[in-house]
């Protein structure tokens, strides 16, 4: 990667059916176990335990053996606080290593994982803050002559507010993600983490059956603004229709 471009990009893969159905707009409406990823301050919105798991083929049009897994849980501790966590695993599949002459040196598997612990605390009736601490590890090769494994740590901090601008239907969130030291695979070049500064708002409408969400995420290393817009409408308590839009200049989406 060129200097200044972020590494450890698997940390920026956004999980969850709800989020992906809403253009990944979640910062200002985070209220379930996926708040451990999108905005840890949103964990204070929980009134009971949440658990979720997802598994998906990743980039199936390019390779047939990449897989992404995300496991998350969250629970209220007391009336004013909550804890949670998630585990992320990205399997890049099997690859063949060759020398400069094209001779095969053997096959190897590449994978990455992250273990995250979350905590949220209410400041007052309408406001809360949250923090994530995470350890992540990446192994891009498992060969005796190749040093391509590294691990590091990072933190996220978030804020969530109900009754924003004195509107009982308006919520607001802010989050700084993947703040930590860069990573190096032993080649002397250090890649920064995919740090983002995000702001989101949510609007409850249609007597609480609908939610409109808008996120603005500034990618620090790419110096690009990502816009996420989503809407959901609950036909019944646990069944919703969702639509979303995302504009990512750096990813050309």
How should these model regions be labeled?
Residues 3-253:
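Subset of outer-membrane beta-barrel
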